[in-house]
């Protein structure tokens, strides 16, 4: 495995990329007696722990930014990182704020689902690395 501490990188983590994966997860949860709300909370908490662990391992000072889609997931990641406040420092596009962690240069962009176009992610990445 390559050492990601020595190379620039982009990492994408998602709970599911396709609708079929969501349905499969819901089916397994139902078989285990877990309802959709509890399943969602488990996934959000797990992603929060995983992302915060990865960010800490890479080093906050080595990252130019973090893009988070989904408000609950973003909140879980920020909580697990132990950050108290995020400051709004700009807007990438309507409804998509650019945030900065107090006392660091780390930037976050958070996007709720259901809006944006095929260029939204490109604009986000550009703002995070610039």
Q: Where in the sequence are the language-model features?
A:
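Active-site catalytic microenvironments in core metabolic enzymes, especially phosphate/sugar-handling
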Residues: 1-130
């Amino acid at each position: 495995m390559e050492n990601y501490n020595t190379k620039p990188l982009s990492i994408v983590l998602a709970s599911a990329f396709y609708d079929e994966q969501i349905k499969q997860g819901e089916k397994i949860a139902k078989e285990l007696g877990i309802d959709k709300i509890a399943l969602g909370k488990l996934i959000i908490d797990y992603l929060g722990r995983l992302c915060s662990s990865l960010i800490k391992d890479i080093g906050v000072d080595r990252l130019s930014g973090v893009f988070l889609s989904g408000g609950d997931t973003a909140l879980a990641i920020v909580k697990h990182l132990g950050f108290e406040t995020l400051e709004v420092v700009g807007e990438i596009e309507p409804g998509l704020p650019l945030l900065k962690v107090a006392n660091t240069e780390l930037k976050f962009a958070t996007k709720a689902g259901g809006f944006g176009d095929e260029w939204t992610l490109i604009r986000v990445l550009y703002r995070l690395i610039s």
